[in-house]
UniProtKB/Swiss-Prot annotation:
Name used for this protein in its record: Diacylglycerol kinase alpha
Activity regulation info: Stimulated by calcium and phosphatidylserine.
Cross-referenced SMART domains: C1, DAGKa, DAGKc, EFh
Domain named DAGKc: residues: 371-505
Length: 734
C-alpha cells in the first residue's frame, strides 16, 4: 500500500513526544556521532538508510528498542514519493531533513515549523502547494481531528473552505508567503497538522494518592476502601479506585472543550457515580447513604450531588452551579477551525504581525464565555507555601475547567495570558507569594493586552505583604476555595501604583550585585533592614538545609537582627547618602538613621506597618492638613504628615526613616507604632557614596556607589477583598 510523505499518524506523533519528554539528548549531539563519530558508517552522503535511522532514534530518544511501527512510520514520513513496504529498508532519507524536524520539535520557532511543514508537503519542490498537495494536508488534518475526538463528519468542508481562504490571491495554489501569513494570523496550522499536541482530551484520569478520613467505595469494583486506607482519586472528576483497580478504570468523563458545533453554547451535566461528600441530595434534600455502598451521583461542572433515583428529574442542561461566574464550561471553548469563515477573518488574532508569530494550542481554541460572567484565569506556583501550592493546583482543576488553571513551573504565565487574550471581563487569580504576583504583573505589562484584567491574590507561604493590604490575608491555611471564589465575586477594583527603579552606578573598581527588579510593587529600602535581609539571603543560599522550616527561619532572622543591632553596620546612614524628592533635597541632618524605607503599600516584613496608623483628631487645622496631604505631590511638613493616610493609588510614595534594628523589632512586635515619617512624594532620587545594602520587595543586594531614581511607572487593576467583620487594617482599607 502506498503512503504519502509526511502523513505520520497523530497517535505515533504523541508517542514520539512522550519519548522526547524523557530524553536528555540534543539533535546536535547525535549529528556529531554521524558526521565524525561511531555512527559515520551509516552515512551515505547526506542520507541514511533505515538501519541508520533506527540508530539515530535509539541514541536521540535514549531507548534500547524503539517500537518498529513507530520507527517505520517516521522513516516513511521523511521519504520522497512513494515506497513499497517490502523494500523500505533499501530506501534512504535525508539526514538534514531528519535533524531539522527533531530540532523544531525540541523548541523551534513557530515560523520555522511552518516553513518546514510547507516544504514537507511540497513534494515536487516547486515552491507552491497545488491542489493535490493541499488535499494531502486536509487528509492529515482530518486524521488529527479524529485523534482529538472532534466530530469529523462536519469538518472536511470546513477545512476545504479554510484552505481556500489561505489562497489570498486566488491563484489556485498556496505560496510559502501565504502559508506563513495564514499560520501567523487566523489559521492554527501547526495544531491541525499535529505539531502542537496539548489539545488532546485523552480520557486519562489525573490520579493522586489519597488517604480517606471516611468510608468510600471504589468506582470500579464498588468494594470499600478502608477508613484511613490509601486509594487513588482523580483530580478532574473525583473518580475513586483502589491502587490495583486503576489500570481497569473507565475513562475520565471530563472533556475540557466542545469538539462539535452542536456542543457549542449549551453545557450538559456530566454525572460521575459517588463523590457525594456532603451526604445530602441537592434535588430532594434527603440524605444520601454514602457509608453503605457506592451510591449517588455528582456533576463535575456544577458539583451538585443527587440520589440515583433523582437523576430523571434533573434535566439535561447544566448552569455550572454556584461558581458559574468564574467557570468556562466546555461549551464555551471550541476549535477555532469550527468558527465560520467570516469569524476567522474578523478574529482579533488576525491583527497580529509576523513579528508576533506565536500561534499555539491556546490560539487554536476560541473562547465565547457565558454572558454576564467573569471567567477566572488561575496561575499557581506549586513551589509556594511548601505543598500548599500543589494542593491548590489540583483543587482548582476540579472546581474550574482545567484549561483555566496554569502551572507556572511548566511554561510561565505567557500561555495563559495568550489563551485569555480576547476574553471579555475576565479576572486573574495568582496563587503564590509576592514574588509570584510581581512576575505575573510584569508579564501582563509585556503582553500588551487589549484589556488589562484585575488581579486577585491567594497568598501562599509567608510574608505576603501585598495580599495583606488587599484583604486576602497573610497566608492560605486550607480554607474552602469555593468561599474564596465567592468573596472574589464581591471584590472591588483598586488601581495600584507601580514604580520604575533606575540604578546608575558610579565608576568604581568595586563590583555590585545585580539589581533584582526594575519595578517596585511593595517597597524599596536602604540600610539596616536590607542588611538583615541580605545576610539571611546569603546564609540561606549557602546552607539551604538550615532553613527548611518557618521556625528555623524566624530564629535565624532574629539572630541576624541581634548581631546587626550590636554592630550597627549602617550607622550614620545620612553621611553616606543624599535624598531628593521631586528635585528638592530632603534634610536628614537632625536625624540619626540606619535605614530609609520607601513604601508603596503600608505593609512590610510580613505585616509590619512602618508608616504607622494615622490618628484622626477633629479640628479645623487637622482638616486643612488632611486636604493638603491628599493632594500635594511633595509633603515634608511633620504636622501634615501626621494626617497622611497611605493610598495604593494616589501616585505617591511614603518615605520612612529607621533608627536601627531594635526599632524595626519594636515595630514588628507592635511595641512601637512606626518609624519616622520623612516625606510623601511622587518621585525620589538617592545619591550614595559607599557600598550599601538595599532591597526591592524583599529581594536584597549589595550596591556600590550609585544614583537611584524612582519614578511612577503605571497603575495595575487589583482586586480588594470584602471588608472583614472586625478590621484592624489601615489606611483607605479601614
Amino acid at each position: 500500500m502506498a503512503k504519502e510523505r509526511g502523513l505520520i499518524s497523530p497517535s505515533d506523533f504523541a508517542q514520539l513526544q512522550k519519548y522526547m519528554e524523557y530524553s536528555t539528548k540534543k539533535v546536535s549531539d547525535v549529528l556529531k556521532l554521524f558526521e565524525d563519530g561511531e555512527m559515520a558508517e551509516y552515512l551515505q552522503g547526506d542520507a541514511i538508510g533505515y538501519e541508520g535511522f533506527q540508530q539515530f532514534l535509539k541514541i536521540y530518544l535514549e531507548v534500547d528498542n524503539v517500537p518498529d511501527h513507530l520507527s517505520q512510520a517516521l522513516f516513511q514520513s521523511f521519504q520522497t514519493g512513494y515506497y513499497i513496504e517490502d523494500t523500505v529498508r533499501e530506501d534512504v532519507v535525508c539526514l538534514s531533513d531528519v535533524s531539522c524536524y527533531f530540532s523544531l520539535l525540541e523548541g523551534g520557532r513557530p515560523e520555522d515549523k511552518l516553513e518546514f511543514t510547507f516544504k514537507l508537503y511540497d513534494t515536487d519542490r516547486n515552491g507552491i502547494l497545488d491542489s493535490s498537495e493541499v488535499d494531502r494536508i486536509i487528509i492529515q488534518m482530518m486524521r488529527m481531528a479524529e485523534y482529538l475526538d472532534w466530530d469529523v463528519s462536519e469538518l472536511r468542508p470546513i477545512l476545504q473552505e479554510m484552505m481556500k481562504e489561505i489562497d489570498y490571491d486566488g491563484s489556485g495554489s498556496v505560496s510559502l508567503a501565504e502559508w506563513l501569513r495564514a499560520g501567523a494570523t487566523t489559521v492554527p496550522l501547526l495544531v491541525l497538522l499535529g505539531l502542537e499536541m496539548t489539545l488532546k482530551d485523552n480520557g486519562q484520569h489525573m490520579w493522586r494518592p489519597k488517604r480517606f478520613p471516611r468510608p468510600v467505595y471504589c468506582n470500579l469494583c464498588e468494594s470499600s476502601i478502608g477508613l484511613g486506607k490509601q486509594g487513588l482519586s482523580c483530580n478532574l472528576c473525583k473518580y475513586i479506585v483502589h491502587d490495583q483497580c486503576a489500570m481497569k478504570a473507565l475513562p475520565c468523563e471530563v472533556s475540557t472543550y466542545a469538539k462539535s458545533r452542536k456542543d457549542i453554547g449549551v453545557q450538559s451535566h456530566v454525572w460521575v457515580r459517588g463523590g457525594c461528600e456532603s451526604g445530602r441530595c441537592d434535588r430532594c434534600q434527603k440524605k444520601i447513604r454514602i457509608y453503605h455502598s457506592l451510591v449517588g451521583l455528582h456533576c463535575v461542572w456544577c458539583h451538585l450531588e443527587i440520589h440515583d433515583d433523582c437523576l430523571p428529574a434533573m434535566g439535561h442542561e447544566c448552569d455550572c452551579g454556584l461558581l458559574r461566574d468564574h467557570i468556562l464550561p466546555p461549551s464555551s471553548i471550541y476549535p477555532s477551525v469550527l468558527a465560520s469563515g467570516q469569524e476567522r477573518k474578523t478574529s482579533k488574532i488576525s491583527q497580529k504581525t509576523m513579528d508576533d508569530l506565536s500561534l499555539s494550542t491556546s490560539e487554536a481554541l476560541r473562547i465565547d464565555p457565558v454572558s454576564n460572567t467573569h471567567p477566572l484565569l488561575v496561575f499557581v506556583n506549586p513551589k509556594s507555601g511548601g505543598k500548599q501550592g500543589e494542593r491548590v493546583l489540583w483543587k482548582f482543576q476540579y472546581l474550574l475547567n482545567p484549561r483555566q488553571v496554569f502551572n507556572l513551573l511548566k511554561d510561565g504565565p505567557e500561555p495563559g495570558l495568550r489563551f485569555f487574550r480576547d476574553v471579555p471581563d475576565y479576572r486573574i487569580l495568582v496563587c503564590g507569594g509576592d514574588g509570584t504576583v510581581g512576575w505575573i504583573l510584569e508579564s501582563i505589562d509585556k503582553a500588551n493586552l487589549p484589556f488589562v484584567p484585575p488581579v486577585a491574590v491567594l497568598p501562599l507561604g509567608t510574608g505576603n505583604d501585598l495580599a495583606r493590604c488587599l484583604r486576602w490575608g497573610g497566608g492560605y491555611e486550607g480554607q474552602n476555595l469555593g468561599k474564596i471564589l465567592k468573596d472574589l465575586e464581591t471584590s472591588k477594583v483598586v488601581h495600584m501604583d507601580r514604580w520604575s527603579v533606575e540604578v546608575i552606578p558610579q565608576q568604581t573598581e568595586e563590583k555590585s550585585d545585580p539589581v533584582p527588579f526594575q519595578i517596585i510593587n511593595n517597597y524599596f529600602s536602604i540600610g539596616v533592614d536590607a542588611s538583615i535581609a541580605h545576610r539571611f539571603h546569603i546564609m540561606r543560599e549557602k546552607y539551604p538545609e538550615k532553613f527548611n522550616s518557618r521556625m528555623k527561619n524566624k530564629l535565624w532572622y532574629f539572630e541576624f537582627a541581634t548581631s546587626e543591632s550590636i554592630f550597627s553596620t549602617c550607622k550614620k546612614l545620612e553621611e553616606s547618602l543624599t535624598v531628593e524628592i521631586c528635585g528638592k533635597p530632603l534634610d536628614l541632618s537632625n536625624l540619626s538613621l540606619e535605614g530609609i524605607a520607601v513604601l508603596n503599600i503600608p505593609s512590610t516584613h510580613g505585616g509590619s506597618n512602618l508608616w504607622g496608623d494615622t490618628k484622626r483628631p477633629h479640628g479645623d487645622i487637622h482638616g486643612i492638613n488632611q486636604a493638603l496631604g491628599a493632594t500635594a505631590k511633595v509633603i515634608t511638613d511633620p504636622d501634615i504628615l501626621k494626617t497622611c493616610v497611605p493610598d495604593l493609588s494616589d501616585k505617591r510614595l511614603e518615605v520612612v526613616g529607621l533608627e536601627g534594628a531594635i526599632e524595626i523589632g519594636q515595630i514588628y512586635t507592635k511595641l512601637k507604632n512606626a518609624g519616622h515619617r520623612l516625606a510623601k512624594c511622587s518621585e525620589i532620587t538617592f545619591h550614595t557614596t559607599k557600598t550599601l545594602p538595599m532591597q526591592i520587595d524583599g529581594e536584597p543586594w549589595m550596591q556600590t556607589p550609585c544614583t537611584i531614581k524612582i519614578t511612577h511607572r503605571n497603575q495595575m487593576p487589583m482586586l480588594v477583598g470584602p471588608p472583614p467583620r472586625s478590621s484592624n487594617f489601615f489606611g483607605f482599607l479601614c
